[in-house]
Design a protein with these regions (language model features):
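Active-site recognition of the HExxH zinc-binding catalytic motif
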Residues: 60, 114-128
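Short, well-ordered secondary-structure micro-motifs within conserved domains or adaptor modules
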Residues: 67-104
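Surface-exposed patches in mature extracellular/periplasmic domains of secreted proteins
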Residues: 64-74, 126-133, 171-175
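Secretory targeting and sorting signals
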Residues: 1-32
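Acidic/histidine-rich, surface-exposed loop or edge segments in extracytoplasmic proteins
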Residues: 35-46, 96-102, 140-141
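The catalytic-center signature of Zn2+-dependent metalloproteases
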Residues: 110, 123-170
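A short alpha-helix/helix-coil micro-patch that ends at or immediately precedes a cysteine
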Residues: 43-69
């Protein structure tokens, strides 16, 4: 009786192992595709502070392997210039925000690149951290006008990388309004 079931069972196990091996050695992994090949693409547009938006995208792309910010397409992160009211972001989910960069903040001496990169951070799922420490991008204006750092620190970059790896759903992202205080 055991021999009657052993041969078909062994065949089924071998077939399952072959299928698993085929999936694990897909053409992408066999070709040694870089991790960025799996990055989630988020499109952005910038009618104001365009050069800063492009630089901010390069910064985030260099620090977050699971994210690829690209200008154009059906933009879900939209950046506009405004006068008055403070620089602010209105997140609408992970990889989605309407951002206003206040020219008065720039005129007051704040780095326009830091402001744009900070506000984009909200669209990527990060909250404000008004601790006044310049090495924290999300400390925003609390770090003062002398702070020129436009790069997320490793903690901030790792958090965005987790979010875009699918470790958390978009509903886990704070969708509050962020305005410079």
């Amino acid at each position: 009786v055991v021999e009657k079931f052993a041969r078909p069972l062994a065949g089924a196990v071998l077939t399952t192992l072959a299928l698993v091996a085929a999936v694990l050695v897909s053409p992408a992994s066999a070709a040694g595709a870089p991790p960025s090949a799996m990055a989630r693409t988020v499109y952005y547009s910038a009618s104001g502070y365009s050069a800063e938006a492009d630089q901010a995208a390069q910064i985030w792309n260099s620090r977050v392997p699971n994210l690829r910010l690209v200008r154009g397409g059906s933009a879900t992160i939209r950046i506009y210039a405004t006068t008055g009211g403070g620089s602010r972001a209105y997140p609408c989910g992970l990889g989605c925000a309407t951002i206003y960069i206040d020219s008065q903040d720039v005129a007051a001496g704040h780095s326009s690149l830091r402001i744009v990169a900070h506000e984009v951070g909200h669209g990527l799922g990060l909250p404000d951290n008004y601790n006044g420490v310049c090495s924290y991008l999300m400390s925003g204006g609390s770090a003062g006008t002398s702070c020129r750092n436009a790069y997320p620190n490793s903690q901030e970059a790792n958090r965005v990388n987790q979010l875009f790896a699918g470790a958390l759903t978009a509903s886990a992202v704070d969708s509050g309004v962020y305005a410079r205080g």
